[in-house]
Amino acid sequence: LVFRVHIVRMVPTVNDPELFALIRLLDDPDENVFEPVFNRIVQYGYRAIPQLEHVWETAEQADQQVRVESIIRRIQYLEIAQRYQYWRQQSSPDLWEGLLILDQLYHREDRTEILRQSMEQLRRNAWLELNQYLTPLEQMNVLSRVLFEHERFKGIDSAREKIASHFIGDILTNRIGNQVGLGLLIQILAEKLDLSLYALSVPGIFVLGSPNVIKSREKKGIDSIDFYLDPQTGELFGRAEIELYMRRIHQPLEESFFEPLFAKQLVEWWLRKVAQKAQESGDLILA
């Protein structure tokens, strides 16, 4: 496989004698030489990548290619980390934007614009099926039908999931995702359609709930939720099913379990799930 970094943004080629000299040192077998060279090239950031790609393509030794790959991965990781920290510092960050940034942890190429177009097409397809006269329950039935019947999205269980099934870009492209990934996709789509649907803190599962706007002003916890959506299947269910589940796992119906999770909480939870799966499977993400 050819190792290339497809960068959508325009990256200027650096005509810097120091960078050229540093790159020539990459074939030095001495690790004591490589470490400071590695750190200095990384400081150039994305500007160094065109030259690094050229070195990778023309390298005669596999060891040199491995070194170049490690530098490029480090540059990418630091760029993603910087953008993610900026996202986290916002008072009300957008969930969709956060997941777009983190998509590059697994995919080296920047697919942002392609994924934006895919999401917009999905939003439009769902919007065409909705109208203002539908009840919230009817609206969710329409959304579920569009996703799981028309668009043919499919959920997979934890035993068969791969790390790719967590990432929003892969789910949009392949139409397959795990419970968490599909749940986040559905919540994002609901937000774009101005539908009231939020991820909840119910232990052990990822479930979406639709709060009753009027009831939620007066009541809390389970009493404020009208119905629930299973992101793996798109099925809607009610209070009786969630109460049965809570009895099975021996959990009380605490109010906090039925409060919506916000973007920062969801992304941090998602990151923990991805890290856990990467450790279990040995899949490589940028680090």
Where are these regions (language model features)?
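N-terminal amphipathic/basic-hydrophobic helices that include classical n-h-c signal peptides
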Residues: 1-9
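A structural boundary/capping signal
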Residues: 10-287
